[in-house]
From Swiss-Prot:
GO terms for cellular component: plasma membrane. It comes from the Bacteria. Could be involved in insertion of integral membrane proteins into the membrane. This is Putative membrane protein insertion efficiency factor. Keywords: Cell inner membrane, Cell membrane, Membrane. InterPro entries: Membr_insert_effic_factor_YidD (IPR002696). The keyword Disulfide bond does not apply. Belongs to the UPF0161 family. The keyword Cell membrane applies. Its main location: membrane. It is a peripheral membrane protein. Disulfide bonds: none annotated.
Amino acid sequence: MAHSVTPLQWVAVKLIRLYQLIISPLLGQRCRFTPTCSQFAIEAIRLHGFIKGVWLASKRLLKCHPLSEGGYDPVPQPKRRN
């Protein structure tokens, strides 16, 4: 089932895509995680909505630093509501 995308989600995803296409290639591959932090942010915003998605992406960005081991770190699935 497809869910609707709010204007705020749409703008956030487009800004991240702009970063991926223009800025990221200039900086080179630096992310220690799979999926990359920018892809994680897009998936989190699409899956959880703008507020929780940005929160999850912010937490992920704080973990991505030179002392981090990195590795596979997917977006958590939403909890089911009964």
